[in-house]
C-alpha cells in the first residue's frame, strides 16, 4: 500500500517543479504568457507557431522566451539578430545538438558525436563536379520517367508525387543503385512513418526515459534502416569491383579515410539526409507548380524563357521562380541548442538592457517570418518571381549583408546547408521538364479552397494540408519538340 502515496507524492512533486520552473523566467528575457498559466505558451505555439510568434513579438519585442514545460525556446526576431544567430560559433549555440532534439530517436547513439565529420564529407562528396553532373543526369531521367507515369493517370496529388520523385533521386544519388533496386519503396515508407512521429509533442514534454508510442515507432524505424544498410554494405563487400567506380555518396564515404571507419553510422547519417533533403525540396517543387497554375502570366514568362535558355540550371527566370517559392514557403524556424551562456548585442532589445541567453535552452530564428517582413519584401504574401529579377538578370537588391540576413532558406555563411546545390538541381530538373513538356491543370475537383493551410509538422518547409490534385498531360508543343 505504501507505493500509492509515494507515487502520488512523486507526481505532485514533479507537477510542483514544472510549475515552479514555468513561473521563474530568466530575469532579462520577457515571456509572452499567452493563454493558460504554465501550459498556455506551449499549447499556443504548438497549435499555430506563425500566429503565436507574431503575437509574442508584438507583446514582448524582438527577444522573448517560450516555455515548453521541460525546456524553453529563446526566440530572436529581426534581420540583425538573424545575422548574430548565424554567425555564432557552433561550440556556443549548436546546430548539431538542435537537430539531435528531433533526431536522437531515429539515429544510433554516438552518431551525433561524429556529425561534423559526416557533414564535412557531404560537402566534399556531393559537390564534386563529376558527381553533380552524374546526379543531374539521374534527376533528369527520374523526372522524365515519373512524369510519363503521371500522364497516364486521371490526376495526381502534387506533394505526394513530388515526394516520390525527390525520394527516387535522393536514393539513387546518395545511397546508390542497389538501395534503389532493392529498398526504394520501403525507404520512402520508413521516411513517411518517421515524419509522422518525429515532431510529436511527447518528445518535448516527456523525459527520454519515459516510454511512449511515437518513440517506440521511431526506434523500430531506426532499427530497420540499420538492417537495410547492413544488408547492402555486406553485399558490396562481396563484390567490390562492381562499386569501385560508383559515384553515389555511400561509395565516396566508404573510400574516404576520414569516414570509412564510421560505417556503423551510415544508416543514421542517411536518415538525417533524407529528412534534410526531402521535405524542403518537395515543398520547393510542389509549391512552384501550384503557384504557376495560380499565376498564368508567370507561367508563360517561364515557358518563354526556358524555350531559349540553353542551360536550365543557369536560367535567371527559373532560378528566380524557385527562389521566390523558397521565400514564400520556407520553414517556420531554425533551432540551435545553447551550450554556453551568450550575451546578445547591446541593442538587441531596446529598453531591456543587456540580455544573456542562458545555457541548456533552444535558441531559434524564423526564416518564414523574416521572409514575410513587409519592411524587406513588398507585398510579402504575394508570390512574385520578378522581385528577384532586374533587366532579365538575377537582382542583388534582396541580398543579405554583413550586418543583416533577410533571406536564408538554406541558412547562411558558415552555416549554409551543404545540400543546397543538389536540392536546387533536383527542383530545376523537375520544374523545367513539367513547364516545357506538359500541360498541367487543376483536376476536376478544382484548386484547394485555402492555400494558407500550411503544414509545418515536418522538419523543413511547409507543405499544403490536404495536398492538391492536378492533371498532367503531354503538351502538343512538348510532343513536337520531343
Curated annotation (Swiss-Prot):
User: According to its UniProt record, in which pathway does this protein act?
Assistant: Secondary metabolite biosynthesis
- Which residues lie in coiled coils? none
Name any cofactors this protein relies on: heme
Query: Which Gene Ontology molecular function entries are recorded, alphabetically?
Result: heme binding; iron ion binding; monooxygenase activity; oxidoreductase activity, acting on paired donors, with incorporation or reduction of molecular oxygen
Enzyme Commission identifier(s):
1.14.14.-
Record's signal peptide: 1-22
Binding residue positions for heme: 417
Entry-linked InterPro entries: CYP450_sterol_14alpha_dmase, Cyt_P450, Cyt_P450_CS, Cyt_P450_E_grp-IV, Cyt_P450_sf
Instruction: Specify the superkingdom.
Output: Eukaryota
Residues bearing glycans: 401
Stated induction or repression of this protein's expression: Expression is positively regulated by the cluster-specific transcription factor pynR.
Q: Which Pfam families match?
A: p450
Provide this UniProt record's keywords sorted from A to Z: Glycoprotein, Heme, Iron, Metal-binding, Monooxygenase, Oxidoreductase, Signal
Name its GO BP terms in alphabetical order: secondary metabolic process
Q: Which PROSITE patterns match?
A: CYTOCHROME_P450
Deletion phenotype: Leads to the accumulation of pyranonigrin J.
SUPFAM superfamilies to which the protein is assigned, alphabetical: Cytochrome P450 (SSF48264)
Indicate the family of this protein: Belongs to the cytochrome P450 family.
Q: What does this protein do?
A: Cytochrome P450 monooxygenase; part of the gene cluster that mediates the biosynthesis of pyranonigrins, a family of antioxidative compounds. The first step of pyranonigrins biosynthesis is performed by the hybrid PKS-NRPS synthetase that condenses 6 malonyl-CoA units to an acetyl starter unit, to form a 1,3,5-trioxotetradecane-6,8-dienyl-ACP. The enoyl reductase (ER) domain of pynA is likely to be functional during the first two rounds of polyketide chain extension, to generate the saturated C-C bonds of the alkyl side chain.
Protein name as it appears in the record: Cytochrome P450 monooxygenase pynD
| Source organism | Aspergillus niger (strain ATCC MYA-4892 / CBS 513.88 / FGSC A1513)
- Write the gene name: pynD
Amino acid at each position: 500500500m505504501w507505493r500509492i502515496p509515494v507515487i502520488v507524492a512523486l507526481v505532485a512533486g514533479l507537477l510542483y517543479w514544472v510549475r515552479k520552473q514555468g513561473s521563474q523566467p530568466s530575469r532579462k528575457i520577457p515571456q509572452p504568457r499567452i493563454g493558460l498559466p504554465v501550459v498556455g505558451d506551449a499549447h499556443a505555439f504548438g497549435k499555430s507557431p506563425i500566429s503565436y510568434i507574431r503575437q509574442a513579438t508584438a507583446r514582448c519585442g524582438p527577444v522573448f522566451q517560450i516555455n515548453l514545460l521541460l525546456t524553453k525556446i529563446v526566440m530572436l526576431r529581426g534581420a540583425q539578430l538573424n545575422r548574430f544567430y548565424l554567425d555564432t560559433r557552433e561550440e556556443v549555440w549548436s546546430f548539431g545538438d538542435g537537430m539531435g532534439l528531433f533526431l536522437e530517436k531515429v539515429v544510433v547513439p554516438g552518431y551525433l558525436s561524429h556529425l561534423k565529420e559526416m557533414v564535412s564529407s557531404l560537402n566534399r562528396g556531393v559537390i564534386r563536379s563529376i558527381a553533380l553532373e552524374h546526379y543531374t543526369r539521374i534527376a533528369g531521367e527520374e523526372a522524365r520517367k515519373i512524369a510519363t507515369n503521371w500522364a497516364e493517370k486521371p490526376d495526381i496529388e502534387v506533394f505526394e508525387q513530388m515526394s516520390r520523385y525527390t525520394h527516387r533521386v535522393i536514393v539513387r544519388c546518395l545511397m546508390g543503385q542497389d538501395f534503389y533496386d532493392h529498398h526504394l519503396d520501403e525507404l520512402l515508407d520508413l521516411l513517411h512513418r518517421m515524419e509522422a512521429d518525429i515532431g510529436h509533442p511527447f518528445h518535448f514534454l516527456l523525459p527520454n526515459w519515459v516510454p511512449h508510442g511515437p518513440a517506440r515507432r521511431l526506434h523500430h524505424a531506426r532499427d530497420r534502416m540499420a538492417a537495410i544498410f547492413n544488408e547492402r554494405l555486406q553485399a558490396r563487400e562481396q563484390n567490390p569491383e562492381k562499386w569501385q567506380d560508383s559515384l553515389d555518396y555511400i561509395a565516396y564515404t566508404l573510400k574516404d579515410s576520414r569516414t570509412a571507419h564510421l560505417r556503423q553510422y551510415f544508416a543514421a547519417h542517411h536518415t538525417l539526409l533524407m529528412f534534410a533533403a526531402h521535405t524542403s525540396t518537395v515543398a520547393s517543387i510542389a509549391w512552384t507548380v501550384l503557384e504557376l497554375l495560380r499565376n498564368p502570366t508567370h507561367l508563360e514568362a517561364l515557358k518563354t524563357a526556358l524555350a531559349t535558355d540553353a542551360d536550365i540550371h543557369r536560367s535567371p527566370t527559373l532560378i528566380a521562380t524557385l527562389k521566390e517559392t523558397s521565400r514564400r514557403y520556407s520553414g517556420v524556424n531554425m533551432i540551435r541548442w545553447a551550450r554556453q551562456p551568450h550575451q546578445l548585442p547591446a541593442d538587441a532589445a531596446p529598453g531591456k538592457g543587456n540580455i544573456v541567453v542562458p545555457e541548456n535552452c533552444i535558441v531559434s530564428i524564423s526564416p518564414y517570418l523574416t521572409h514575410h517582413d513587409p519592411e524587406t519584401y513588398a507585398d510579402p504574401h504575394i508570390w512574385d518571381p520578378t522581385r528577384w529579377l532586374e533587366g532579365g538578370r538575377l537582382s542583388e537588391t534582396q541580398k543579405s549583408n554583413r550586418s543583416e540576413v533577410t533571406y536564408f532558406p538554406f541558412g547562411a555563411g558558415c552555416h549554409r546547408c551543404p545540400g543546397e546545390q543538389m536540392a536546387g538541381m533536383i527542383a530545376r530538373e523537375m520544374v523545367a521538364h513539367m513547364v516545357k513538356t506538359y500541360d498541367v491543370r487543376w483536376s476536376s475537383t478544382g484548386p484547394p479552397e485555402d492555400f494558407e493551410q500550411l503544414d509545418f509538422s515536418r522538419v523543413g518547409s511547409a507543405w499544403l494540408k490536404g495536398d492538391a490534385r492536378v492533371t498532367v498531360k503531354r503538351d502538343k508543343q512538348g510532343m513536337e519538340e520531343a
